[in-house]
Amino acid sequence: MASIIYSPKDIFEQDFKVSMRGYDKKEVDVFLDDVIKDYENYLEQIEKLQMENRRLQQALDKKESEASNVRNSGTAMYNQKPIAQSATNFDILKRISRLEKEVFGRQIRE
């Protein structure tokens, strides 16, 4: 980004050499007044944008931290899931075994 050469104060305090066929001093003053106003507006806009940029960067950092926490807790839950599934599978196998004993036990008796 290009650096700013003049501040509003520098522009205001700038003196021009006067020559016989020089520019109209009032016209130059009016123009420079407008330039100073523009400069002040630009500086104000830059400050607002920098503040917004900082605020958005902080919000982004917060969201990234939250996302990381969610990922970490999701990984922990994923790692715990196989244990719960194996316990469930074991219960299912026990039920199947009990049902087979009942079904095949009835067939043998009949």
Swiss-Prot record:
GO terms for biological process: cell division; regulation of cell shape. Keywords: Cell cycle, Cell division, Cell shape, Coiled coil, Cytoplasm. It is found in: Cytoplasm. The keyword Cell division applies. Residues 32-73 form a coiled coil. Its main location: cytoplasm. HAMAP family: GpsB. This is Cell cycle protein GpsB. The lineage of its organism: Bacteria, Bacillati, Bacillota, Bacilli, Lactobacillales.
